[in-house]
A protein has these predicted regions:
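N-terminal beta-strand motif that seeds the catalytic metal site of vicinal oxygen chelate
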Residues: 1-18, 68-70, 120-129
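Vicinal oxygen chelate
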Residues: 2, 5-14, 32, 43-46, 61-129
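Core segments of cupin and vicinal oxygen chelate
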Residues: 10-51
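Conserved catalytic-core motifs of eukaryotic protein kinase domains, centered on the activation segment
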Residues: 35, 56-57, 127
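A short beta-turn/loop motif at secondary-structure boundaries
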Residues: 35-38, 60-62, 97-98
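Generic preference for hydrophobic
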Residues: 45, 52-54, 106, 116
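Active-site/binding-pocket entry motifs
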Residues: 51-52, 58-60, 122
Length: 129
C-alpha cells in the first residue's frame, strides 16, 4: 500500500461561523457543505485539491491540534499575498527560504498557522525536512 496524498483535513475550531468566514471570505475556500445543526456542527470547504472540514469543538471532545502547521501550495504566492491584504487579512509578507520555497503565513481564528507556499521547483517540493 502507498499513501497517495492528503485527502481530507479536519480542524476542530472554537467558533464554526467565525472560522467559516475566515476560510471562505478571507482565504477564498469554497463552501461545499455546511451542517450547523449536526453534532458537532461542521462545514466542508474546498480549495484546489484540498478538502477541509471545520468541526465545532465540543467540551466532550479531546482538544488536539496545537503546534500543528499546514503548508498549502499556491501557484503564485505574491499574487495571493496581494489578494489577502486587499481582504484585510493579517498576513506576513512573502519570504524566500533556503528549503526551496517562497511563502506567506497567516493564523486562523484558532491560532492554527497556515503557510501558503510557491515551490521553486518540484525537487524543492519533494524535499524531506
Amino acid at each position: 500500500m502507498s499513501i497517495a496524498g492528503l485527502d481530507l483535513l479536519v480542524l476542530e475550531v472554537n467558533n464554526l461561523e467565525e472560522s467559516l468566514h475566515f476560510y471562505s471570505d478571507q482565504l477564498g475556500f469554497e463552501i461545499s457543505k455546511h451542517t450547523p445543526d449536526s453534532e458537532p456542527p461542521m462545514a466542508t470547504l474546498r480549495g484546489g485539491k484540498l478538502k477541509l472540514t471545520l468541526a465545532q469543538h465540543l467540551e466532550t471532545m479531546l482538544r488536539r491540534g496545537r503546534g500543528v502547521n499546514f503548508f498549502l501550495g499556491v501557484d503564485d504566492v505574491d499574487q495571493y499575498y496581494r489578494e489577502l491584504t486587499e481582504r484585510d487579512v493579517e498576513v506576513h509578507p512573502p519570504t524566500d527560504e533556503g528549503w526551496g520555497g517562497r511563502f506567506i503565513t497567516v493564523q486562523d481564528p484558532d491560532k492554527y498557522r497556515l503557510f501558503f507556499v510557491t515551490w521553486f521547483d518540484e525537487s524543492a517540493k519533494a524535499k524531506e525536512f
